[in-house]
Amino acid sequence: MGEPQGSMRILVTGGSGLVGKAIQKVVADGAGLPGEDWVFVSSKDADLTDAAQTRALLEKVRPTHVIHLAAMVGGLFRNIKYNLDFWRKNVHINDNVLHSAFEVGARKVVSCLSTCIFPDKTTYPIDETMIHNGPPHSSNFGYSYVKRMIDVQNRAYFQQYGCTFTAVIPTNVFGPHDNFNIEDGHVLPGLIHKVHLAKSSGSALTVWGTGKPRRQFIYSLDLAQLFIWVLREYNEVEPIILSVGEDDEVSIKEAAEAVVEAMDFHGEVTFDTTKSDGQFKKTASNSKLRTYLPDFRFTPFKQAVKETCAWFTDNYEQARK
């Protein structure tokens, strides 16, 4: 059984980020139901590292449900540099949000994890049972461990108080409103920004690394639909991986080619192999998702890349970069 419909007041933390904006769009485009009141907040509304501010926000909104997206995030190179900062800031945010949600009587919290939480040394495909089987990749251990702790905390809230606090594990998310910063962003938005600059200046495109690592990319608007389904229908405390299938994994080289094609770039493409590749692959199984939603249709990768590139070009001045 899903949540009884109606009488849902849903607070979305991190509402101005990539996934928050996607949920906002999907809700506005008709996915919201009568009786659902959606409240999207960002760091402008409260500093979630501060317990008193977080509690005041939750007291004010009085949500029945929370989608917790707020986090200090960054790409591979920023993670390598600031493992402690990622750990400390996020541990405060997560504890403040989860405990304030508990204190105001929220019926359900859905938090957002990441596939980087999985053990570095593992078998593939990875699934939801493997989260705590070994240490994560050393490059971003601070962020990885702090995200794992949400799963630990969810289980503890359930054991001690019977709370339905759960989490989703998306693979590599991309789409409109992403962070397109070349130094600090994730791989795909970074590539989009680089291609835009190379095209504008007539220079070559340099892709960091060998281009060989493989990733499962999920379009933010697809993820938004799945988040809403989890909020209404998924009642396990165990996390669920939200991902395209294993066969839809693409190499960084293929991702770069999709961006080059979408942006009609005709310059030279080179790979800077002095830059780190990070994990070679982190192939995730979406079989648990498919047992619940066998017919869910993901946006084809090239179409999603095309839409994201078009959004970035149209919103270049305002885009995070």
From Swiss-Prot:
The record marks 147 as: Lowers pKa of active site Tyr. It catalyses: GDP-beta-L-fucose + NADP(+) = GDP-4-dehydro-alpha-D-rhamnose + NADPH + H(+). The record marks 114, 116 as: Important for catalytic activity. The lineage of its organism: Eukaryota, Metazoa, Chordata, Craniata, Vertebrata. Homodimer. GO terms for biological process: 'de novo' GDP-L-fucose biosynthetic process; positive regulation of endothelial cell migration; positive regulation of endothelial cell-matrix adhesion via fibronectin. PANTHER family: GDP-L-FUCOSE SYNTHASE. One of its GO terms (molecular function) is isomerase activity. Pfam families: Epimerase (PF01370). Substrate binds at residues 194, 208, 215, 277. Pathway: Nucleotide-sugar biosynthesis; GDP-L-fucose biosynthesis via de novo pathway; GDP-L-fucose from GDP-alpha-D-mannose: step 2/2. It is an enzyme of class 1 (oxidoreductase). Catalyzes the two-step NADP-dependent conversion of GDP-4-dehydro-6-deoxy-D-mannose to GDP-fucose, involving an epimerase and a reductase reaction. This is GDP-L-fucose synthase. NADP(+) binds at residues 14-20, 147, 170-173, 186. It comes from Pongo abelii. Keywords: Isomerase, Multifunctional enzyme, NADP, Oxidoreductase. InterPro entries: Epimerase_deHydtase, GDP_fucose/colitose_synth, NAD(P)-bd_dom_sf. Its EC number is 1.1.1.271. The active site is at 143 (proton donor/acceptor). Belongs to the NAD(P)-dependent epimerase/dehydratase family. Fucose synthase subfamily.
